[in-house]
């Protein structure tokens, strides 16, 4: 293995990289950092070793070391957009969204075609409830990488909050096309269909959620309410007791069952 090869020839830097990757898989970040230290000492201009070492520092929550490392990378490779993005991620872990936004913007100035950076930027906008910004940023991420299911689900949330219901529905549909078992997309689409008065198709979505998560009592409650609304009284008589058993003080379910 890599350790045996290193013992035979300790000056082949790629062996340290291979062992570091193995250690990362085992979440031995300290060991991986030690290997990258040796690899960098032998090959100081291999950018990925610097970058991977910084990621290990982030994963081991050595945030100050990770910031210092990203600073070193940026000094050596000023046009390396991923280093700016990584620096932003460190600031996010330090709960400083202002600094994080600044470094994400710098990353996007260098490489405006990186979908993951747009996704991180959009997630920050969602957290701040800047819905219109999140909609635009997720649009860019989706344009660049159109098969990321989570981006459609998140953009649907942004669009709901700017009253673009048609756009939100299209995003939920696309998320489910890409990932048919995504129960969150099914659940949220069910809620949106209720809002749009499409009760029968909403029931279909809640049926799917309950099939995937039999103990999802909110989906059970919503399905019972909709079945009652559509005239199927046997449905709520079946669904409401399950909810009441779990939440005996939920007066809404008690009154609806009555």
PLM region spans:
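Alpha-helical tetratricopeptide repeat
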Residues: 1-258
């Amino acid at each position: 293995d890599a350790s045996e090869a290193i013992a035979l020839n300790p000056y082949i830097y790629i062996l340290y990289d291979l062992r570091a990757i193995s250690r990362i898989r085992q979440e031995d970040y300290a060991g991986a950092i030690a290997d990258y230290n040796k690899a960098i000492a032998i090959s100081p201009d291999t950018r990925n070793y610097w970058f991977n070492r910084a990621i290990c520092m982030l994963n081991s929550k050595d945030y100050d070391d990770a910031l210092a490392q990203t600073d070193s990378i940026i000094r050596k490779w000023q046009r390396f957009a991923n280093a700016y993005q990584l620096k932003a991620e460190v600031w996010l872990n330090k709960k400083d969204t202002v600094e994080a936004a600044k470094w994400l913007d710098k990353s996007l100035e260098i490489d405006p075609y990186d979908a993951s950076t747009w996704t991180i930027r959009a997630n920050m906008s969602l957290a701040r409830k800047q819905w219109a910004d999140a909609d635009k940023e997720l649009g860019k991420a989706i344009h660049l990488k159109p098969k990321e299911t989570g981006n459609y689900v998140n953009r649907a949330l942004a669009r709901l909050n700017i009253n673009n219901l048609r756009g939100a529905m299209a995003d939920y549909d696309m998320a489910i096309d890409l990932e048919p078992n995504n129960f969150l997309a099914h659940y949220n689409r069910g809620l949106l269909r209720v809002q749009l008065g499409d009760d029968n198709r909403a029931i279909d979505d809640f049926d799917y959620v309950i099939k995937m998560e039999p103990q999802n009592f909110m989906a059970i409650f919503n399905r019972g309410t909709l079945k009652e609304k559509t005239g199927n009284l046997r449905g709520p008589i079946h669904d409401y007791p399950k909810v009441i058993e779990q939440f005996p003080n939920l007066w809404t379910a008690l009154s609806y069952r009555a």
